[in-house]
Design a protein with these regions (language model features):
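Short low-complexity, flexible loop/linker segments enriched in glycine and/or proline
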Residues: 48-50, 170-171, 241-244, 269-270
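Ordered, amphipathic secondary-structure segments that act as subunit-interaction surfaces
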Residues: 69-81
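Structural beta-alpha unit
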Residues: 78-126, 222-253, 257-266, 273, ...
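Short Asp/Glu-rich motifs
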Residues: 44, 139, 166, 237-238, ...
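Small/aliphatic-rich secondary-structure junction motif
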Residues: 1-56, 149-152, 159, 163-232
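Short secondary-structure boundary/capping elements
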Residues: 13, 108-111, 138, 178-181, ...
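Gly/Ser-rich helix-loop-strand patches that form or flank binding pockets
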Residues: 18, 27, 113-162, 244-287
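A short acidic, glycine-rich active-site loop
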Residues: 54-68
Length: 287
């Protein structure tokens, strides 16, 4: 977790996104890179005077918002006491291993989510806010683009900034490829955690290893992990994961995203959808 990408848009959870990234950077000596995520402009310019003026006004508004995003990012990093690195500066391998947390702002990046999906492939993880339905919430498209297009994990910041991260880790295990990838990406956190719990829920499993098997596998990596398999009841697997996370004192949840199809979860609900709607702790996700 030596490099973190923070796409910055103006939403209510932005302070939590910054705080989450800083907590990870302090834990691993990471470089945090911020970019302004702007909507893609239309691929054509209207030829009439009114349409052309509207397009120009929208472009100017987007540029002003990007400048505001950069100022907020820099202010948050400075307030956290992180030193600044200039964009384009190379990381020396020998120095990077022992470097402390630091940040840089990357100006003038292309607009649109397509850029984010591609650029995020260069980073250990991308930190985004938990999406919501309110106008001031982070956009679902930002989360999904980074999740599906980057090939890297997503660290989901809760609406309220966390006080700590990575001391008590809960793995929401369902036997799937997606969760196996999330666990693999989370190994830096798991190796440093004080407590790890592998949790499975009856009714939330797909064919695959059990929670007990995962705990044994982690032991071979030098990680002590407890395991628990909860029986089916009136609560859904998503509710069981979050309820147990709260009782465990979890400050980081590990979860594979969309083991069931995204469309199915949109219609019928599912663990990923429940966590996206209700998680109050940081969540590391992979697809």
């Amino acid at each position: 977790m030596k490099t973190l990408l923070v796409p910055v848009t103006l939403h209510d959870a932005l302070p939590s996104v910054f705080a989450t990234a800083v907590l990870v950077a302090r834990r691993f000596g990471s470089l945090i890179e911020g970019v302004a995520l702007r909507p893609a402009l239309a691929e054509y310019v209207p030829v009439d005077m009114v349409g052309g003026m509207t397009w120009l006004r929208d472009e100017e508004a987007d540029q002003a918002e990007a400048q505001d995003a950069g100022q907020r990012f820099v202010a948050a990093m400075e307030a956290a006491g992180l030193p600044r690195r200039e964009p384009g500066a190379s990381c020396a391998p020998d120095a990077a291993a022992n470097a402390g947390p630091r940040y840089r702002w990357q100006p003038d990046v292309p607009p649109g989510d397509a850029f984010l999906g591609q650029y995020a492939r260069l980073f250990s993880a991308t930190v985004v806010g938990r999406p919501g339905a309110d106008d001031g919430s982070p956009r679902m498209t930002t989360f999904e683009t980074a999740l599906f297009e980057s090939g890297r994990p997503i660290l989901l910041a809760p609406p309220v900034a966390p006080a700590c991260l990575g001391e008590a880790v809960l793995i929401a295990w369902n036997g799937s490829t997606e969760t196996a990838r999330a666990v693999a990406f989370a190994m830096p956190f798991l190796r440093r955690a004080r407590r790890v719990l592998v949790l499975s829920a009856e009714g939330g499993m797909v064919p695959g290893p059990r929670a007990e098997d995962v705990a044994r596998s982690l032991a071979c990596e030098g990680i002590e992990a407890a395991h628990k398999a909860l029986p089916a009841g009136r609560r859904t697997p998503g509710e069981l994961y979050l309820d147990t996370a709260e009782s465990f004192g979890c400050d980081l949840l590990i979860k594979g995203a969309y083991t069931q199809s995204r469309l199915r979860q949109m219609i019928f609900g599912g663990p990923t959808s429940h966590i996206l709607s209700h998680a109050t702790v940081p969540v590391l996700m992979a697809h």
